[in-house]
UniProtKB/Swiss-Prot annotation:
Positions bound to Mg(2+): L213, D216, L218
Protein family (similarity comment): Belongs to the diacylglycerol/lipid kinase family. YegS lipid kinase subfamily.
UniProt domain DAGKc: residue ranges: 2-131
EC numbers on record: 2.7.1.-
Enzyme class, UniProt record, top EC level: transferase
Native source organism of the sequence: Klebsiella pneumoniae (strain 342)
Full protein name: Probable lipid kinase YegS-like
């Protein structure tokens, strides 16, 4: 008889046939841990499985996939007002959130942490009162790259694929003119890259919001400004601390307005529009994380 409550593992269909994953699940089951497994086929499945998890009386719902899968499960838990904890099993291309919070790369270790690790309250962001992100919202150059990078290239090269595709597209990408407001913050101009982070990194390891914490009640903003991408990039790389092309801000909410349609990437999920309101919901979710997680204050 297991001393641990049952868990429900929600797998992105792309990672369901991973042999190491099957081995990790069977290993823990042999130890007496009760793990229910469900595989998503289309958008909305995660919400349905969480409703099932409530009926199964599990204490942890594990998101097995990339940043998009973690986002879908996390936002569904918050929308349902569930007290179940979120566990994380990194099976995606970039795994930005899992990497930044210190989830082990070894699947067996990650799965065990997701079930028996200590759960702590963390923040999550809501966007336009209908969707959200647990890690980061990115706009501009980075969003176009992650959206346009071919699936075959991502499968072959992982997070490096974003960099390669970005270098191929540098000469065609232009900035977005927009206005951004927050608590004691106002900026207007041409943005090459916008990062609004609950977490720190996106796009396969790019530290867009290096000071962000997931339990401080704040969103961290970083804007890379300028009209030409390559000169701005070289200026930033040469002297990041004093670069005139970087604007930082901190607030519990940000509003972005643009004269044209923009696209933000919310943990891998695109959202287009001319107006965005992003606000943090403090301590809205419980998540099983390593004891030395660097994103906790």
């Amino acid at each position: 008889m297991s001393t641990f409550p049952a868990s429900l593992l929600i797998l992105n269909g792309k990672g369901a046939n991973e042999p190491q994953l099957r081995e990790a699940v069977n290993l823990l089951r042999d130890e007496g841990i009760d793990i229910h497994v469900r595989v998503t086929w289309e958008k909305g499945d995660a919400v349905r499985f969480i409703d099932e998890a409530l009926q199964l009386n599990v204490e942890t719902v594990i998101a097995g996939g990339g940043d998009g899968t973690i986002n879908e499960v996390a936002t569904a838990l918050v929308e349902r007002g569930s007290k179940m904890a979120l566990g994380i099993l990194p099976l995606g291309t970039a795994n930005d959130f899992a990497t930044s919070v210190g989830i082990p790369q070894d699947l067996a270790s990650a799965l065990k942490l997701a079930i028996v690790g200590r759960d702590v309250p963390i923040d999550i962001a809501r966007v336009n009162d209908k969707t959200g992100f647990i890690n980061m919202a990115t706009g501009g150059f980075g969003t176009r790259i992650t959206t346009e990078t071919p699936e075959k290239l991502k499968a072959a090269l992982g997070g490096v694929s974003y960099l390669i595709h970005g270098l191929m597209r540098m000469d065609t990408l232009k900035p977005d003119r927009c206005e951004i407001r927050g608590e004691n913050f106002h900026w207007q101009g041409d943005a090459l890259v916008i990062g609004i982070g609950n977490g720190r990194q996106a796009g396969g390891g790019q530290q867009l919001c290096p000071e962000a914490l997931i339990n401080d009640g704040l969103l961290h903003l970083r804007i890379f400004t300028g009209e030409e991408l390559i000169p701005a990039l070289f200026s930033t790389l040469a002297n990041p601390e004093n670069s005139p092309n970087i604007v930082d801000g901190v607030s519990s909410w940000f509003e972005i307005t643009a004269p044209h349609e923009m696209t933000f990437n919310l943990d891998g999920e695109p959202l287009s529009g001319k107006t965005f309101r992003m606000e943090l919901l403090p301590a809205a979710l419980r998540c099983r994380l390593p004891p030395d997680c660097p994103l906790l204050r």
